């Protein structure tokens, strides 16, 4: 598919129409059905034609799944270098002990043999039901098709990583570094068990930029803190979530670092990709009908701004009110109050869809019909001004609908 670019005046980069994980030079991606799911794609891969500087961040859940343990160890041994990633859905390979780790390493070996690269340059990821062993005969079948061009489409990869998601999530942007075109692509999955500090969420980012692994890791950690770690669907944190980035140096320019004159341009583009994917995950929450954005400003610290934003968007009462299109701002105030952060009610100002509802801690009369009309929109915004400092943060989530219970009551069946 021919890619088209659209440039917004507020960005120093272009959003590539139909852009994807394999839009950056030197990357291919694919996916196929190997029988882990009844009739949907369930096995995917990314391959770079050259060795890529790589970095990853992982779940904070102490029951870290086998593929994450193996990938983390692999990146340490390879000193942040990868050339391929393989991922399966429908089976998390979590709580599977030493066999789970052995199976993840065997998967690495099979992929490495097919691509004729060292196994320490292969990352592995899984998502799905916890507590079941991988059916390795099916996994092997998948690895044997990695070089088959019939399955080598980014769309197939996007589908292969899904579980309860209702749609694929992907993007690519381009920018100029030293006068040369650099591209950043991304793909993600996530719908349920999404909570700050990442959960049942996988995100993969590729770029043809020239950047070293340690710089890439610092950038990824910083970006994740205010993007992927600022989303919540249901407050659960999974064993398998990971964000992984590969930069294969195929565009030859001065190595990117904080000293590069166009470093901030690259950072802005990278953060945009992460934010886009994070919001797409929040919007696709299980049973969700609305995306919720909570903008907190005037906090004494970034940590307070983030915590208050996440507390509001995690509140089941707030989420239920948004689903019911009910302007029950008392639930927002309650969440702010129990967040554990420093606040002063007399300085607190709240807007719901840009309509003031609280000023200096007091309720504000508003047009109920106008408010009701705005709450029918698919994107609901909550703005909180604390009046205590200059720190700000944004959290993303979704409403809580009847379908959330229906979906999760029958997840294994």
Curated annotation (Swiss-Prot):
Gene Ontology CC entries for this record: cytoplasm
Keywords annotated in UniProt: Acyltransferase, Amino-acid biosynthesis, Arginine biosynthesis, Autocatalytic cleavage, Cytoplasm, Multifunctional enzyme, Transferase
Binding positions for substrate per the UniProt entry: 163, 189, 200, 286, 408, 413
Subunit structure: Heterotetramer of two alpha and two beta chains.
Catalytic activity: N(2)-acetyl-L-ornithine + L-glutamate = N-acetyl-L-glutamate + L-ornithine; L-glutamate + acetyl-CoA = N-acetyl-L-glutamate + CoA + H(+)
Provenance organism: Staphylococcus aureus (strain Mu50 / ATCC 700699)
EC number(s) given by UniProt: 2.3.1.35, 2.3.1.1
A GO BP entry: L-arginine biosynthetic process
Keyword Ribosomal protein annotated: no
Designated name of the protein: Arginine biosynthesis bifunctional protein ArgJ
Main subcellular location: cytoplasm
Family from the record: Belongs to the ArgJ family.
Role description: Catalyzes two activities which are involved in the cyclic version of arginine biosynthesis: the synthesis of N-acetylglutamate from glutamate and acetyl-CoA as the acetyl donor, and of ornithine by transacetylation between N(2)-acetylornithine and glutamate.
